[in-house]
């Protein structure tokens, strides 16, 4: 498994960079293959919205200038990663300009996967968790705004797939000068938990059976049978009336999705509960 640590700070020292160092130190101590990307050391060009926003980024999902500025190679590293830690200083309640520039270009290439020339293409963020760290030099009042900024950018880059959980956020960590010590501990624990969560058995196959049962096989060859009839018969889910609809269940990650309903209903196979 590969962790990509993406740094949006222009410094190689100070508050924000100390969290970059903590993320790398944690990954190394856990035996996680990791790499730090210091965006400030790159010379990425800003998105030029080629052809009125309908350039090769839209149709073929790479940047026409990306071979020269390093963006296309960086996007390949995003593809190869299994999880991400984004670390940014907070400037005017938003992520840093370097990180914003990178996310603008990445969003142009990834959010359009469903609409371009390759209909089977999926976002490089699909089913990959992210931790977002926002470090403020003052009291931290700008951190919520930076989180919203990052959530919107990463969520959009996750593609036009439903459910939006495909671009997952494992944790948001707000940092200031006074809480930095215990927030470093929190970051270390978050990385450990994120990879423990990632290593859980994934669904291999799901077979709907009679009486609203699902026979599930995981990728470690473990098998389980889940009975969801008590949930299905509740008043709130009365629209799901027959086994025909049940057999249309689709599988994503560890969740079952019922598309026939007006609202997409999710069942967590870990707990057997509606989400």
Predicted regions and their residues:
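Short, acidic Gly/Pro/Ser/Thr-rich loop/turn segments
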Residues: 11-13, 138-140, 265
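Short, solvent-exposed coil/turn elements at secondary-structure transition points
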Residues: 40-42, 136, 170, 209, ...
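Short, glycine-/small-residue-rich phosphate/pyrophosphate-handling segment
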Residues: 113-163
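Motif-centric detector for short Cys/His coordination patterns
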Residues: 195-275
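Short secondary-structure boundary/capping segments
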Residues: 75-76, 121-123, 248
């Amino acid at each position: 498994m590969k962790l990509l640590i993406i740094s949006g700070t222009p410094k190689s020292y100070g508050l924000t960079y100390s969290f970059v160092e903590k993320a790398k130190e944690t990954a190394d101590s856990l035996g996680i293959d990791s790499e730090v990307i210091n965006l400030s050391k790159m010379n990425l060009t800003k998105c030029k919205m080629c052809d009125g926003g309908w350039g090769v980024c839209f149709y073929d999902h790479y940047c026409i200038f990306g071979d020269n500025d390093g963006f296309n190679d960086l996007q390949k590293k995003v593809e190869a990663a299994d999880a991400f830690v984004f670390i940014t200083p907070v400037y005017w309640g938003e992520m840093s300009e370097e990180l914003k520039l990178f996310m603008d270009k990445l969003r142009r290439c990834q959010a359009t996967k469903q609409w371009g020339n390759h209909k089977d293409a999926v976002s490089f963020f699909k089913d990959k968790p992210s931790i977002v760290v926002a470090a403020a030099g003052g009291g931290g009042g700008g951190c919520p705004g930076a989180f919203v900024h990052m959530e919107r950018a990463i969520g959009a880059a996750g593609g036009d797939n439903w459910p939006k959980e495909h671009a997952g956020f494992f944790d948001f960590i707000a940092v200031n000068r006074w809480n930095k010590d215990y927030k470093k501990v929190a970051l270390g624990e978050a990385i450990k938990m994120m990879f423990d969560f990632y290593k859980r058995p994934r669904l291999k196959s799901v077979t709907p059976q009679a009486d609203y049962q699902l026979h599930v096989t995981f990728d470690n060859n473990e098998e389980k049978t889940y009975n969801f009839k008590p949930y299905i018969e509740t008043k709130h889910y009365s629209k799901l009336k027959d086994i025909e609809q049940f057999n249309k269940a689709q599988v994503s990650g560890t969740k079952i999705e019922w598309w026939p309903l007006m609202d997409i209903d999710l069942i967590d196979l870990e707990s057997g509960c509606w989400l």
